Every structure is written in C-alpha cells, then in structure tokens.
C-alpha cells in the first residue's frame, strides 16, 4: 500500500528562488524518506527570516559519522540496503546544493520518528 505521509504546518510557506529547483530539492527529500520508511512526516515552519521544511521518517536512518558522506555525489551508504532501491545517489547532493545556492542549507539529524530528519532551511 506504500508509505504513510503526514504534512503539518501552515498551508504554504513563501521563499524567493527558482521554483523548479526548489520543488526538485523538496521532492528528493520526500523520495528518500519514502524509499526507506513506512512513515514520513513533513513539517513546515514559517519563521521570521526563513522557512524550514523538516522531512522525518521512521526508517533505518544514517549514523552521525556518515551523514556528511551522504552528501557526496553518487553516494549510496549501504549497498546491502540500497541494491534493490532505485536512485542515483544524487538526491541529497542536489538538494543541499540547491539550498545553498538560495542562501539556505540542508542538515541531517536524528528524527523524532526514529529514523532520519532532513531539515531544509530557505530564507524568505
């Protein structure tokens, strides 16, 4: 039946930037979460200077020591886990590059759901 996805926060957040590139960055984060987890939560936060988009999942996560490696192009951290999972290993790289090109950033941390949290921050 596929993953369960929940979205919380305001109806929309506004940021300045290239719409297609930003859409692709967010889509990459959601795609990664749903590949490895059964539950995904997307939280939008509209702060005074930036919008935050948190994508949390209940998957296996990435240990802290390997999180920076996850941003390397074509990196697939666990071949045993990813060999039957589609993807090129470029999603996180492109998402972070897009965030930084827009004056923002992308960070990975532990998720309250037990897996990984990808936090995309984009200035207004």
Predicted ranges, named:
Residues 39-49:
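Short beta-strand/loop element within the Bergerat-fold HATPase_c
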Residues 4-13, 113:
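Conserved catalytic submotifs in the C-terminal HATPase_c
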Residues 22-23:
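A residue-level detector for a conserved hydrophobic packing site
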Residues 91, 95:
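Short alpha-helical Gxxx[C/S/T] motif in the catalytic ATP-binding
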Residues 62-76:
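Short conserved segment of the HATPase_c
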Residues 57:
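Acidic ATP/Mg2+-coordinating residue in the GHKL
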């Amino acid at each position: 039946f596929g993953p369960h996805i929940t979205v919380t926060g305001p109806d929309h957040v506004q940021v300045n930037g290239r719409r297609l590139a930003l859409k692709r960055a967010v889509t990459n984060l959601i795609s990664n979460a749903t590949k490895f987890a059964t539950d995904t939560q997307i939280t939008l936060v509209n702060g005074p200077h930036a919008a935050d988009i948190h994508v949390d999942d209940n998957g296996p996560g990435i240990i802290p020591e390997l999180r920076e490696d996850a941003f390397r192009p074509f990196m697939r951290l666990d071949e045993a886990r990813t060999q039957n999972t589609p993807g090129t290993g470029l999603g996180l790289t492109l998402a972070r590059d897009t965030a930084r090109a827009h004056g923002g950033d992308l960070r990975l941390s532990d998720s309250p759901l037990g897996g990984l949290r990808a936090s995309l921050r984009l200035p207004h």
